[in-house]
From Swiss-Prot:
Species this chain originates from: Gorilla gorilla gorilla (Western lowland gorilla)
Protein's UniProt name: Neurotrypsin
Disulfide cross-links: C94-C166, C110-C150, C139-C164, C196-C260, C209-C270, C240-C250, C306-C370, C319-C380, C350-C360, C413-C476, C426-C486, C456-C466, C526-C590, C539-C600, C570-C580, C620-C751, C662-C678, C766-C832, C795-C809, C822-C851
Segments forming domain Peptidase S1: 632-875
Location relative to the cell: Secreted
Residues annotated as signal peptide: 1-20
Extent of Pro residues compositional bias: 57-72
Top-level EC class: hydrolase
Glycan attachment sites: N26, N684
UniProt-annotated stretches for the region Disordered: 29-89
Keywords carried by this UniProt record: Disulfide bond, Glycoprotein, Hydrolase, Kringle, Protease, Repeat, Secreted, Serine protease, Signal
Length: 876
């Protein structure tokens, strides 16, 4: 509409008036009946920049009689075309992706379905029994025919029904440099309008981007109203959580006039949350958002993918990257129509385990020998009742026939099974031919038997269109499960690997905590019965061929989120983890302290030769393995091998269970630094103690771990058991000079500070490490926590005369940042990194008032005050 025609329409009252929103009924926007406007001029409530007037209220006009449902579909959504999709009717409501409309096409508010009385004067266009009791008020079409509709209350207080405006709530971006940015415009009451930028943030922007299928990450921007021309403002103070599927589902206020902050409208910039290395993907030409031709956005333009070697494993990755769960299937030969523009990729060979197509082996960008007749496509069929699959075979083309119903896969009994039934199943799965296979070829299912006495004519397009018994009614056992082998007609189909697997928090990509992606969420595996055979299957699925070792008891740290799987039982020969799961997903009796892990391509500890000893003995404070940060109190798991000088002083087993007594710091191959108070209880007899180096998980023997006897204990001569001053000691390990502990990437010495060095001025980036109190229990894995050094006056004020010049003060003073080093961490190191240099042990954990107590920082022995004494004893 040109500006002149817009102004003329404005003068003639041809534009609708924005009246208000109803916060209870999903903030649906209402306006007056466009067929029966009241006499006189009819202006919108607020147009910028020339007009500001509050909304007018008036009684709703008489309501019309409703015609028969038309055959035409509702108007197409503009942003869907922009995103490369052609909208199709949603089986229950408006076009797929817009099922949240709750206003009729003449502006009446929809009633909640549960609020509609059972007896009506006029019958709606279709049975609505399935919707009774629903608490929402979204427009629906129960029989899938005709336009969506809803009930509303008319001016006389009676309940009537009306068709809905399916474009209501559509959004688009205007005025940006590309389709991923611009001013937000919302379609309501037949007119595109904008949103006031008050309280507009990234959560609101992300909902817009998700609704437009332009990625899940949005950045909030603002645009001056002065550049937008004459346009209504609909909303202000939009308050989205960020996970809504449509802007209509967010809390917001109807625009009541006034002034927007700096007279700015809401705008967004959209991006895909996977980061710049993950290409932007969309599906085009399909009948829904769950299927279509694969198109990638690269170098400023959209292009397609060639179908050479394209299979279901590639489709799984595409569906995962798009956030679409369900069954992934690859389609070939431009099944969803030929695309335009360049062919971006060829020879894509995913394993099915990647999170993005960028991680798959493939050709270079733009290199191919294809035309658009070979454009690749995918379908990501949602797991709704009636979805079918073939399971337990060598690929997606063969196996037990399983049907999804009420959240669970079940089988089909073979009573009365015919070739026509097989034909319908294979055709629905995208294959040309098929035959019934012997049930002995595939492992028996342990789930329910959902269907029996199925009879197809061969003309059905969907398996559930065939006649059958009611769900769950049968007289069969699993020995009668239907098994099928379908023939792809020359197209190779590799095995679909089921849910993806990843390894987390290891020191390299070949080890870590095992996590699986199920139901749209990463979760862990419980270690009940976890063995090297299970680890072998995980490593094989990830593409590793060497020996595999299982790790238990959260060896790589505790995961977050759900525990998906328990009691895995692999023989070691399975193709993927999915073949080993015998228990229902999500059923377990575990905690994250039992998370399972693996090490792939495990060849044990490599022997340390003389060259290794020579190269490492001359350095200190070197961290060969460091990447991330999980907890002492307020801390986090360290990376295995990330603090190679961390050792533990342990009681020998005849004094108990060989338990950890104190932390300590390796200064050289034969000398260890710790706290003097560690020897108060059991004395300073060397027979009572051992030192463990290279340890990470206290209960799991590890390849770099070594327990060494104690040859000598040297406690500072000024230390008194009834005092905390001079709390420092040295321990000489058993062995020839400089040959006590063997250095490796996991065993290295720390550096000493300079004499009288003041770390508050020379060092930053400080950490405490140990196996101590985590706030819940003592940790099995080595913990780390960043900790700030504090001016000594904080501890002098708190501890008075107990704090001396031979001590350091460190910790967080705020209760919500509880970082402290306690109990099992006594004697352990406080390490700081010299800028651009190495790691130095500035403190030895000594004492404090409680653990992580507000206003009670930890006290550490100041190592720089004892450097001459340390060097005189150790000859370093």
């Amino acid at each position: 509409m040109t500006l002149a025609r817009f102004v003329l329409a404005l003068m003639l009252g041809a534009l609708p008036e924005v009246v208000g929103f109803d916060s209870v009924l999903n903030d649906s926007l209402h306006h007056s009946h466009r067929h029966s406007p009241p006499p006189g001029p009819h202006y919108p409530s607020y147009y910028l920049p020339t007009q500001q007037r509050p909304p007018r209220t008036r009684p709703p006009p008489p309501l019309p009689r409703f015609p028969r449902p038309p055959r035409a579909l509702p108007a197409q959504r503009p942003h869907a075309l922009q995103a490369g999709h052609t909208p199709r009717p949603h089986p229950w409501g408006c076009p797929a992706g817009e099922p949240w409309v709750s206003v009729t096409d003449f502006g009446a508010r929809c009633l909640r379905w549960a609020e509609v009385p059972p007896f009506l004067e006029r019958s709606p266009p279709a049975s609505w029994a399935q919707l009774r009791g629903q608490r929402h008020n979204f427009c629906r079409s129960p029989d899938g025919a005709g336009r969506p509709w809803c009930f509303y209350g008319d001016a006389r207080g009676k309940v009537d029904w009306g068709y809905c405006d399916c474009r209501h709530g559509s959004v688009r971006l205007r005025g940006g440099k590309n389709e991923f940015e611009g001013t937000v415009e919302v379609y309501a009451s037949g007119v595109w309008g904008t949103v006031c930028s008050s309280h507009w943030d990234d959560s609101d922007a992300s909902v817009i981007c998700h609704q437009l299928q332009l990625g899940g990450k949005g950045i909030a921007k603002q645009t001056p109203f002065s550049g937008l021309g004459l346009i209504p403002v609909y909303w202000s103070n939009v308050r989205c959580r960020g996970d809504e599927e449509n802007i209509l589902l967010c809390e917001k206020d109807i625009w009541q006039g006034g002034v927007c902050p700096q007279k700015m409208a809401a705008a967004v910039t959209c991006s895909f949350s996977h980061g710049p290395t993950f290409p932007i993907i969309r599906l085009a030409g399909g009948s829904s958002v769950h299927e279509g031709r694969v198109e990638l956005y690269h170098a400023g333009q959209w292009g397609t993918v060639c179908d050479d070697q394209w299979d279901d494993a590639d489709a799984e990755v595409i569906c995962r990257q798009l956030g679409l769960s369900g069954i992934a299937k690859a389609w070939h030969q431009a099944y969803f129509g030929e695309g335009s523009g360049p062919v971006m990729l060829d020879e894509v060979r995913c394993t099915g385990n990647e999170l993005s197509i960028e991680q798959c082996p493939k050709s270079s960008w733009g290199e191919h020998n294809c035309g658009h007749k070979e454009d690749a496509g995918v379908s990501c069929t949602p797991l709704t009742d009636g979805v079918i699959r073939l399971a337990g075979g060598k690929g997606s083309h063969e196996g037990r026939l399983e049907v999804y119903y009420r959240g669970q896969w079940g089988t089909v009994c073979d009573d009365g099974w015919t070739e026509l039934n097989t034909y319908v199943v294979c055709r629905q799965l995208g294959f040309k031919y098929g035959k019934q296979a012997s049930a002995n070829h595939f492992e028996e299912s342990t789930g329910p038997i959902w269907l029996d006495d199925v009879s197809c004519s061969g003309k059905e397009t969907r398996f559930l269109q065939c006649s059958r018994r009611q769900w769950g009614r049968h007289d069969c056992s699993h020995r009668e499960d239907v098994s099928i082998a379908c023939y792809p007609g020359g197209e190779g189909h590799r095995l679909s690997l089921g849910f993806p697997v990843r390894l987390m928090d290891g020191e390299n990509k070949k080890e870590g905590r095992v996590e699986v992606f199920i139901n749209g969420q990463w979760g862990t595996i419980c270690d009940d019965g976890w063995t090297d055979k299970d680890a072998a299957v995980i490593c094989r699925q990830l593409g590793y061929k060497g020996p595999a070792r299982a790790r238990t008891m959260a060896y790589f740290g505790e995961g977050k989120g759900p525990i998906h799987v328990d009691n895995v039982k692999c023989t070691g020969n399975e193709r993927s983890l999915a073949d080993c799961i015998k228990q229902d997903i999500g059923r377990h009796n575990c905690r994250h302290s039992e998370d399972a892990g693996v090490i792939c391509d495990y060849f044990g500890k490599k022997a340390s030769g003389n060259s290794n000893k020579e190269s490492l003995s001359s350095v200190c404070g070197l961290r060969l393995l460091h990447r991330r940060q999980k907890r002492i109190i307020g801390g986090k798991n360290s990376l295995r091998g990330g603090w190679p000088w961390q050792v533990s002083l342990r009681l020998k087993s005849y004094h108990g269970d060989g338990r950890l007594l104190c932390g300590a710091t390796l200064l050289s191959s034969c000398w260890v630094l710790t706290a003097a108070h560690c020897f108060k209880r059991y004395g300073n007899s060397t027979r009572n103690y051992a030192v463990r180096v290279g340890d990470y998980h206290t209960l799991v023997p590890e390849e770099f771990e070594e327990e060494i006897g104690v040859q000598q204990i040297v406690i500072h001569r000024e230390y008194r058991p009834d005092s905390s001053d001079y709390d420092i000691a040295l321990v000489r390990l058993q062995g020839p000079e400089e040959q006590c502990a063997r250095f490796s990437s996991h065993v290295l010495p720390a550096c000493l500070p300079l004499w009288r060095e003041r770390p508050q001025k020379t060092a930053s980036n400080c950490y405490i490490t140990g196996w101590g109190d985590t706030g819940r229990a003592y940790s099995r894995t080595l913990q780390q926590a960043a900790i700030p050094l504090l001016p000594k006056r904080f501890c002098e004020e708190r501890y008075k005369g107990r704090f001396t010049g031979r001590m350091l003060c460190a910790g967080n003073l705020h209760e919500h940042k509880r970082v402290d080093s306690c109990q099992g961490d006594s004697g352990g190191p406080l390490m700081c990194e010299r800028p651009g240099e190495s790691w130095v042990v500035y403190g030895v954990t000594s004492w404090g008032y409680g653990c992580g107590v507000k206003d009670s920082p930890g006290v550490y022995t100041k190592v720089s005050a004892f450097v001459p004494w340390i060097k005189s004893v150790t000859k370093l």
